[in-house]
């Protein structure tokens, strides 16, 4: 009832806003600029694209002062982007319409495709991309399996960087913020129109942490990030251009520290006296105060290299060929305290190496007849290696050590290596039945193989040849799409679509013994039926879009416990396909130019998420129980963002002020819906101001002014029997900057 009331209230507000706006629109002389998107692998007006997509231009992005894509979560309905804080490289939890994954392990494939310059980022670590030198951002909601492929069951975040201009020029930005934060961004363009070059450099250093470690009374949470990008663009002839982009990134930071939320019945409290004082309150009493008895300053590191080669060839007036080669490698090191206490109960030293290579070739038609299409071939290879040391201080509970002494720590060394090879063919065709009705049909066939090799031993690199722990598995899948759109007039589009997405199966990357590491789990699929309209009203001064969707989730992959006689505690956590779920909802987007100075943007997402079937074992008893009553993770029934922008001429320059409020409804962050990690409603308020004088911009920004401290991650270890940990979002931040264009 509360959700229905909230939706009714927001809907009334929207139509009141439209009515009020229509009264004053006559004072404005400028209309809304056309937004061009590439959501369907070709350039289209966003209002003529028959799918749910939100988009930001370069100017929109700059005026919001985002650090990374997390700061853009409010730009789309039904979108949550959280930093999992479970390692360097900002492992990311992206949930669109309640569909997502929140885990750092690389065997957990993404549900949302983060795509940079046409290249898919294949792991959650490194997916929290920095918003540097971006030309556009597109957020596609719903399965995008046809054109973007596997692991896009929730949607796609498509980012495109600016191209070299071929002229000498550039931009330098220098900024400073609280927590002793320094920002330096630079862009240099040079060359000629036929051989254009661009160098982008970035240094962002937060020298003071926002956390206090109660063990040594020093700060934690510091971070330093640097990036250098070289971009070249060559015009081979009038019909072909080749672009090469090389990016090197380095991130050094304090390892994140978990908060202990274990209550009276948990092992942490009952046995070791490490207790939470109340529901949702950490042991420290404050979400920004932690216990870390092995603090190491900036010892967590993430190194990344990305190379992208793209060939764009206009074969003729009717056909265009695109080829994209993407190569990405990462190397991460982190020693992390997970128990959230002054003791060493569970710490990990977790290093990981990852690499991916992708090839995509596609042909796009531009025919004069009723039929046009995109057809292509895609190849993907990736692998990762993790040698991990777990330092466990609670084995005494299972008779593994002679006494209940938290000073006795048992090291366990796990080695995991997994590989993925995938190939796919895809197509999507539009057929104009008449001048108003278009039928779209598409599909993608995927053939994928994964392998896993794992073992334990007395040292960090045990000999896996001593035991047969290798396994591989092959899956195939066809994901279809059918849509029909009706262009009622040049300002109004209706559409109805059916699409399907596929998320890969795999092998457990987090395991208790070698044999659970080679136990496969199946792929999962999401099927979406969606109806929508896109409208441009009031003489091109109001854009209003609406979508209604019904998504069915099959073979949902979740972590469960199984009996395991080989494990020291008699149980093991594995990934299995244990649930079916439904996600239904409504999405509204509105942008209005009130007059030549004032504009309003609003998006609203209503979501009804539930499990249809959920039978699993979370106690290691061997008998699954019915958990259908639980709510899916990060699936608030209501999200909305309201932005107000005012621009005016102030003296010799141009002033700009934007204020926004981003509301996230109450939701769970732990799979078992622990009330300890439950997030109440949050409303994050941001403010940005700038003054542009000739080629210089002076700016101020503030984020999370309301200091919302909701949890970005929550986990019940052994179904909450051992302890529950969580980590909170960053507090309020502010900064100033000067940008000079030359």
Where are each of the predicted segments found?
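Structural signature of Gram-negative outer-membrane beta-barrels, strongest in the C-terminal barrel
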Residues: 233-237, 363-366, 372, 376-380, ...
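Acidic, small-polar-rich N-terminal luminal/periplasmic segments of exported/outer-membrane proteins
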Residues: 31-167, 531
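Transmembrane beta-barrel wall of Gram-negative outer-membrane proteins
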Residues: 169-171, 176-206, 211, 215-257, ...
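Gram-negative outer-membrane beta-barrel transporters
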Residues: 373-374, 435-439, 550-552, 576-671, ...
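N-terminal Sec signal peptide and the immediately downstream disordered periplasmic leader
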Residues: 1-66, 70-74, 238, 274, ...
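Solvent-exposed loop segments that connect transmembrane elements
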Residues: 210-219, 256-293, 338-348, 389-415, ...
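Membrane-embedded beta-barrel scaffold of Gram-negative outer-membrane proteins
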Residues: 190, 308-336, 487, 493-503, ...
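C-terminal beta-signal and adjacent terminal beta-strands/loops
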Residues: 662-670, 690-742
